[in-house]
Design a protein with these regions (language model features):
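Intrinsically disordered, low-complexity protein-interaction/activation regions
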Residues: 1-170
Length: 170
């Protein structure tokens, strides 16, 4: 994939839509849920039209040029929209979640060295609150808080693993 600069989005809302779909972790989000998230209380017909315009704008910014109507990244399934990032595209939030899960699995299996290594990978990926440029956005509040709590829990786990190993300097 190629880097898409924020100024390439013709509509600011398209960038917000991309962010919303990113945190969904490839799970479809219904059009109704997106409309309520983006325009709470808006008249449904107008909101649906606005959503279609935003989806089109987002696709123009991130989809490869194609004559076909099959979408590569911004897809629909079960009446919802989702972002289908391929394995060749790196998403730090997915890597973070994966590292936490791998660390927990290793810890549960008693492989404390591997657990500590993968937990540390996750900690290194966390560079601050999710979408810092949108500090008051309600649509990402829960995920932002969840990631922050996950980091704090992971730091506690790391320190516990280090203490159990007699490593008081980590």
């Amino acid at each position: 994939g190629e880097l898409v600069a924020p100024e390439e989005f013709k509509r600011r809302g398209a960038l917000t839509l991309l962010k919303i779909l990113l945190v969904q972790n490839r799970r479809p989000l219904s059009g109704d849920a997106l409309m309520e998230t983006l325009w709470p209380g808006a008249e449904p017909r107008a909101a649906r039209n606005r959503l279609h315009v935003l989806v089109h704008s987002l696709r123009q910014a991130v989809e490869p040029p194609s004559r076909h109507r099959s979408w590569t990244y911004v897809c629909t399934r079960d009446g919802g929209y989702y972002l289908d990032a391929t394995p060749s595209q790196y998403l730090d939030i997915e890597e973070f979640r994966s590292s936490i899960a791998l660390g927990a699995r290793a810890e549960k299996q008693g492989d404390y060295t591997r657990a500590a290594t993968t937990y540390q990978t996750a900690i290194d990926l966390y560079r601050g609150d999710l979408f810092q440029g949108d500090p008051y956005a309600q649509w990402c509040w829960w995920e932002r808080e969840h990631l922050r709590e996950t980091v704090l829990d992971t730091l506690r786990r790391l320190s516990g693993l280090a203490a159990a190993n007699g490593d008081w300097e980590t």
